[in-house]
Amino acid sequence: MALDASSLTRKLHVFSAKYVKISEETTRRARRLVKDYIEGQIIAYITENSNIEIQKLEYTGSFYEGLKTENADEADIMVVLKTPGSGIEVVQSQVPGYVHLKARDAPMFSKYMSPKGYIKAKKLRNSWFQSYVRRAVNKIEPQPPHSEVRLVVRSHGPAVQVDIIRKGSEEMLLSVDLVPCFQVEDSWYVPKPFKGKRYLSRNELLWRKTFSPKEKQILASMDKDPNGQGGCRHELLRIVKTVVKKPVTSLPLDSYHLKAAFMHYNDRGDLDWVSEDALGKNFFGFLMELQIRMESRNLPNYWLDGINLLDDFKEDVVKQMANRLRRILNSEVRLNKILE
């Protein structure tokens, strides 16, 4: 299909304004809720009452990367725990991307350690972190201008999820994933459960290496050109994240897969991000990149060698995605349809 990049760019700007961009009001509200309830009360309560100390907070995920779409209703915060003076030893496991964490002279973690000194991921998250979050929520004091809310706590993967809900209407104002983690030198580890097919006798000791802070460094600043030219990367990725969820497109790719594919695409040195029709050219180019990845059934983890993110999907699902993308790329009618 011959590409009219200028026309496509105009349509993409209209689509972005209509379906993608989030309002300043909801963004300000999300930041205020994090400040008043998460930082000001939950984190403050844990800091004041637990013998396990919090070193710092890392603000990660789409909201803080400038990639959130439609509504500012989710936030991700990594709660970095202070390690003992003797430090934490990282011991490689047999599972790619997962490690064991061994602590010495660390009485604050003794309840959550194996006899050999390995920190139990699930036990630390549930018995300590989630327990303290629940206690903090039970003592929450309403904070204007958002005082008519209630907080609900639940488990969510490696996180303790705190939902801030408007009383009466039951409207979800903000859902915050709080993830306890350890930072060892320039690496971060979170208690993400292992869900692989092989049986592991001690999977409660596994900690997942996460690259969220490094990912944020790349994604949050990717349009800050040193020459001051900027670019359209943020807008492009927000648009694609929105497009893939539309029923007419229906690609079961989540933000995690799209960010990885985009970082690979962005590493190419021959891309134009600043011309008037750059958005249209790169929208088409990135969809082609996704189609090629699906066709070859190969989307490498951006950070870890030997991990194919498409292994998350059944083979026929990947084939369907490849075919769907090919039909969109080969038909102007279908391409326009996904932007309606």
Curated annotation (Swiss-Prot):
Keywords assigned: ATP-binding, GTP-binding, Immunity, Innate immunity, Magnesium, Manganese, Metal-binding, Nucleotide-binding, Nucleotidyltransferase, Transferase
Q: Does the keyword Coiled coil apply?
A: no
Family of the protein in this entry: Belongs to the mab-21 family.
Instruction: Give the binding site residues for ATP.
Output: 62, 74-76, 241, 255-259
The uppermost taxa in this organism's lineage are:
Eukaryota, Metazoa, Cnidaria, Anthozoa, Hexacorallia
Source organism of the structure: Stylophora pistillata
Q: What is this protein called?
A: Cyclic GMP-AMP synthase-like receptor 3
Give the domain of life: Eukaryota
Quote the EC number: 2.7.7.85
Function summary: Nucleotidyltransferase that catalyzes the formation of cyclic di-AMP (3',3'-c-di-AMP) from 2 molecules of ATP and plays a key role in innate immunity. Acts as a key sensor of double-stranded RNA (dsRNA), the presence of dsRNA in the cytoplasm being a danger signal that triggers the immune responses. Directly binds dsRNA, activating the nucleotidyltransferase activity, leading to synthesis of 3',3'-c-di-AMP, a second messenger that binds to and activates Sting, thereby triggering the immune response via activation of the NF-kappa-B transcription factor.
- List the Gene3D superfamilies: 3.30.460.90
Q: Where are the transmembrane segments?
A: none
Biological process (GO) annotations held by this record are:
innate immune response
Q: Which residues bind Mg(2+)?
A: 74, 76, 177
